[in-house]
Amino acid sequence: MVKFPFPLLLAIAFIKIGALASASVELHVSPSGKTGATGSATDPLPSIKDAANSIKSLSPDQKAQGVTVLLAGGFHFLPEGVVIDSSCSGTSNVPLVITAEQGASPVLTGGHPVSGDQLETVKDASLLERLDTNARGKVRQIDLSKLGITGITPFPQVFSGDWRPLQVVLGTNSLPISRWPNGEYGFTTMKSVTDNGSATNGGTFVYRDDRPVRWQKALADNELWLRGFWRVPWVINGAQVKSIDTNAGTITFFKDVGGGIGSKYKKDAQGRRSGDGTEAWCAVNLPEEIDEPGEWAVDFKRKLLLIWPPEGVSAQNPILVAANKDPLLALDNASYVAVKGLRILGSLGDALQIRSGENNLVAGCDISNVAQTGVSVRGGKNHRIVSNDIRETGGSGIAAAGGVKATLEPAGHEILNNDVSRSANDFPEPAIQIGIGGASQILGSAVGIHVSHNRVHDTANAGIRFGGCDHLFEFNEVYRIGLNSGDLGGFYGYCGFTGFGNVMRNNFVHHSMNGNAFYMDDGTSGALVTGNVAYKCAMGVLMGGGHYNRFEYNIMIDCPKGIHLDDRGISRKYTLEDKRLGGDVQSVSPDQSPWKEKHPELAALVAGGETTIPKGDTVIGNVLINCGTSIELPKPEYAAGIEQKGNITTGSPADFVDADNFDFTVKPGSTLVAAIEGFPPIPFQQIGLQVDEYRKSIPQRDMKLLREGDTTKRKFSSTTDIEASNKK
């Protein structure tokens, strides 16, 4: 696939979307609109749904002239979400455009607005007794039934991704569900494990603090749940507490948490996991733990939202309480639809979802405060997600899939110039997810997706995670990832043996000491990682047992390990008989067209038969500066299939234009690159966000946070994981 520079791609996008000037039909929508309105500027429709119905009634000739839906300022409440289907599609010359009226700031939200008069005093004596003494008189209650929220149910005995009962928002901030310990990364740890749990038993652990003594009333009401990293530091699950023994200092669950409790890295002689004292957990949704303004909890029995209102609540700035899990705006098999310049927030589902269709555009939007994904693209062709700000999501900021791997038909999607931050707040998913799927959704196959010029930062999990093949990742900046998880990467590939054609070039990954900059995990093969800069990451490159991966002409600075390639495929039996790896290979027929022509290495790998030992990998021309271990390869007998040459460990900050301020442009005439034959220039100034039609300026990075912030809150050792797994 031919790839074009970023400005040209945007120009193509703008041509496809077209200009508003030619649109002959304008439909105005206002929160104050009336049912039966005409949709004129003076008689606006009450909702986008009404606008969609009006579009369906237009004649083909009217649609052919183009349609624009213009939203007035204010909160557009979408309690059930809105679906734009194929009957509303535009064309390549005149798309359907959904945008704001000139000068207006509309907000699409699934949140019921709640202001002062709906915040009632807590009168139930048993509830008041449960509140912290400092919170009594400050906590208010909201009767959910008065908001029309009637289907809310308690958490199950074990839960993972889709767990949040409500999304509660004020302004641009998601208000936190009550927890102990406080803080978005507030956790305590287990002291030890007395029972790992089984199919018939939930497991028991010893707690450290006497805080659980306060939770006896919640326990008596069967409304006590904990969330924790019970077994490994990259999977968080919730579990309902069955009992607390305050004499023994133990907590017992109703039901077994997947894999049991207790770190998998510490086993006794009998194979029982006694725990290593680092397993992190917290209590959630307890009235007893509402002790700060903004915190809230749901009383499932009484159908009440208990909240300590923060300052600033008013009719103009209400608390938004969202309970609907449908996407706020869904393009369902629609094509040539442009959603531009809108603010979308407050949902238990996705903010915006594209299902099938072709050539849709989401551009210049401000998307936040949703419990699932900001923008989800599920199939279709040539969709573009351009220059959006996406933050405060429970799962991924952007997720996309499409294309057909067996035929190498590309999706053609483009994810360009987006600022994605503070994702994975509720469950461990990457900021940008290409294919694979996860806790929030199953995305499916992904082929031929272009991810460029994005800024990904301050996220609990991975930066960009991908499956599939033939993707291009270039000019992205990724930093401060893995703030609440482990075993992840700035770029994390989970593609198996069929991951050929994935290119990562000219990216900058930095300040992520709990993540590896480029991580090709569990047999991922066929990737090209070239011309990238990794600074202050756990590892610059980590390859786990893959083949035909090329790590060439990268710069690694201040990483404890520069480049690590291992042979885990031997101990983990990465053979063609493996259901995951072998089944994936069979699904693409590597000895037939188009695979045999485009990616002949896969057919060669299969023909050779031996797939447990690394084959065809290269480590060439890399610069490693101040890395504790520069290059780490398997034992010589297993490293014969890895080509290593021309790598250097010399160099200093003086070789770069402004290393102190993280500008790693190599100075002209530097001896650093001259020492490596064929080292291509890295266009460092082109990395990251760019000014375009939708993004008028580039937000500054928080330099103080970069210099002083902690990125090891959930410290994870890839080396420990490799060693432990290889002993199986």
Enumerate the predicted regions with their spans.
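Beta-strand repeat scaffolds of extracellular/surface proteins
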Residues: 32, 72-74, 87, 100-103, ...
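Positively charged n-region of N-terminal signal peptides that target proteins for export
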Residues: 1-7
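Boundary at the C-terminal end of the N-terminal hydrophobic targeting segment
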Residues: 21-24
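Extracellular polysaccharide-degrading/modifying enzymes targeting complex plant/algal/animal polysaccharides
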Residues: 28-355, 361, 376, 581-595, ...
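Surface-exposed extracellular loop regions of Gram-negative outer-membrane beta-barrel proteins
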Residues: 360-366, 523-527
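Bacterial N-terminal signal peptides
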Residues: 7-18
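Glycine- and acidic/polar-rich repeat regions and solenoidal domains
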Residues: 81, 349-353, 371-378, 391-663, ...
